[in-house]
Amino acid sequence: MAEQGAGGDGHRGGDGATHSDPASDGYKVQEKRTAPSRPTSTVSGQTSNHSGNKPDPPPVLRVDDRQRLARERREEREKQLAARETVWLEREERARQHYERHLEARKKKLEDQRLKEERRRAAVEEKRRQRLEEDKERHEAVVRRTMERSQKPRQKSNRWSWGSPLHGSSSIHSGDPDRRSVSTMNLSKHVDPVISKRLSSSSATLLNSPDRARRLQLSPWESSVVSRLLTPTHSFLARSKSTAALSGDTASCSPIIMPFKAAHSRNPVDRPKLFVTPPEGSARRRTIHGLASHKREREREHVPFHVSPGARRTLSPSNLKARSPAPARLWLPSKSMPHLPGTPRPASSLPPGSVRAASAQAPSSSPGNIRPFKREVKVEPEKKDPLPAVKSRVPLVKVEEVTVEEGTPVKPPEPAAPASAPIATPAPAPATDPAPVPAPSSTVTVGVVPKTSAGTTDPEEATRLLAEKRRLAREQREKEERERKEKEELERQKIEELARRVAEERSRREEEARRLEEEQAREKEELALRLAEEERERWEREEVERVQKQKEEEARAREEAERARQEREKHFQKEEQERLERKKRLEEIMRRTRRTETADKKTTEQRNGDIAKGVLTGEPEVPALPCMASSGNGESAESPHGVALQQSEVTTESSPDLEKQPNENGMSIQNENFEEVINLPVGSKASRLDVTNENPEIPLKPILAFNDEGTLGPLPQVDGVQTQQTAEVI
């Protein structure tokens, strides 16, 4: 029995050590799995030597441990889930930060591209604006030059037209009396009545001709030309009937006075000059009129005009003052004309030396052999005309000088004075005297040159020539007007074409720039849309992946929870099955124990010794099971009653062979250890005590509730059963 007690104590001690050291969860779980398989000793009696050992803890503590372990597992799982969620949140935060950095980089790159494109577009726009400004300035310069050119010919055409008054006409007409030579005026004073009558009739015929009604009113300059043409010349007087009354000296009228503006050119060298040609052998007067064709007139523009040095006529101081404001006009005075026979010849106030010095320029060989010579007249050029398109509207007139050749059959009553003899022109009166007859002057000399012819003696011829001149001038003017209009129209068309081209080019450039801007804007929009679409797709893909991962994690968590729940259910089912098996075994043991106690009751009372004394004293014994199922601290109540109870239990658990053993000196063998120890593992065969115990009323082991609610029978029933058993034993 001592060995049995030691074995029982060893088993209980192992159980107590197991429950008293909950160091690790794995060990506890292993304990929970191995605890149901451990045998529970229900020996009711032990010796007093083992009374100090701790009893097994109640099964309620195991349920609490399981609940605590389950709670710890739940907390651990919650911690793991929280850690996983934290990791997920950190990953999402990192992904979001990476996405934001990526977006910032893309935005910065797009902004840089936009700024670069704007700078390039601004540079292109600036260049285009500069080109447009340059084109505009060039176009304005062309238009300005064209307008200046178109206005200047119009002004010159108006200035040179036959019907418009000439500039400085007042000075011309104020000096009209001086434009004739003295001899012509003297000739007009001393003309014969027959000639006057003839001239008057010719003048009347000219002025009253039917062609005059068709013509416009003559300008003052034209009137002066007509009056000079109607003035009789020396050749006409020589051929007239009154030639005998005239002296042998020839006289000439003043040449045709042409304003210098008839010779115009851009270069002073190209300006035409009046020239006088000597006669070839006849004393007749010839006048070369303006050509009808424009080509011949242009060719004639470059022919220089030559004036003989003897044809210069000095002006009086009054005339110099009057003509000084118009230095550009050249008035070609006529050569001095000898007086008629009836007129006294004024004496020259010049000494012969001065006269010879003045006339030294003209070569003179003999009085009868006279040859004229030419001399160019230099005048101040006018302001250069920027457009030489407008030509002179006044036809050029070439005046031939008429000289008296040697041997001309003129019969003068007195011999003619030598042609080379200088004749001093009288100087005019004081400036206040308007008389046309000049007074002699010592500073004025006239070279002896042949006289010039001023026109024809026939009034019809003069009228015809004048009409022809006017017709040619009108045709020339109309032609020039047409050419000017055509040129202006051409210039205008060119300007319009240039403006149209500039406008088209500007519109084309603007359209191209607008199209380029639209394309760039469209490309930017497409790029932005594409980027947004890519970002959206990436975000959706990440969202789908995140949701998928979350679903997978949730599925794994559910699977793990389901697996844990199934394992827990299996474990609970196994424990329940083991508990039921233990309950059945306990019931069988209790049943066998009750049968053994009832069978051995009488034999125990007949024995002499301590047991009989204890029975007779009637002391109550404390049941063993309540002591074994004491409070959770595992301590058992140590008392003599407990020792006696253990002795009685050991006695009851003895085999039937004990009855056959002899009782020496009336004492039972109590200190001998039984060889047979009750050990009922799962599936073991019942011993002989189990076979003999057939009473099912007494349970072998107290009923414990494995559930928290305690659905099975309570522990007090076991206590009641133990008390009844003890009473029956007593």
From Swiss-Prot:
GO biological process: cell morphogenesis; cell population proliferation; fertilization; germ cell development; glycosphingolipid metabolic process; homeostasis of number of cells; Leydig cell differentiation; microtubule bundle formation
The keyword Lyase appears for this protein: no
Post-translational modification: The association with microtubules is regulated by phosphorylation during the cell cycle. During interphase only phosphorylated on serine. Phosphorylated on threonine in mitosis.
Compositional bias annotation for Basic and acidic residues: 62-151, 294-304, 373-386, 461-610
Residues the record lists as Phosphothreonine modifications: T231, T277
Low complexity composition bias: residue spans: 357-367, 440-453
Annotated crosslink Glycyl lysine isopeptide (Lys-Gly) (interchain with G-Cter in SUMO2) location: K273, K295, K374, K378, K398
One GO CC term on file: basolateral plasma membrane
Cell division listed as a keyword: no
Modified residues (N-acetylalanine): A2
Locations listed in the record: Cytoplasm, Perinuclear region; Basolateral cell membrane; Cytoplasm, Cytoskeleton
Keywords: Acetylation, Cell membrane, Coiled coil, Cytoplasm, Cytoskeleton, Isopeptide bond, Membrane, Microtubule, Phosphoprotein, Ubl conjugation
Residue ranges with Pro residues bias: 425-439
Modified residue annotations for Phosphoserine: S161, S183, S200, S202, S209, S219, S235, S254, S282, S336, S366
Family stated for the protein in its record: Belongs to the MAP7 family.
Function noted in UniProt: Microtubule-stabilizing protein that may play an important role during reorganization of microtubules during polarization and differentiation of epithelial cells. Associates with microtubules in a dynamic manner. May play a role in the formation of intercellular contacts. Colocalization with TRPV4 results in the redistribution of TRPV4 toward the membrane and may link cytoskeletal microfilaments.
Subunit: Interacts with TRPV4.
UniProt protein name: Ensconsin
Lineage, broadest ranks: Eukaryota, Metazoa, Chordata, Craniata, Vertebrata
Gene: Map7
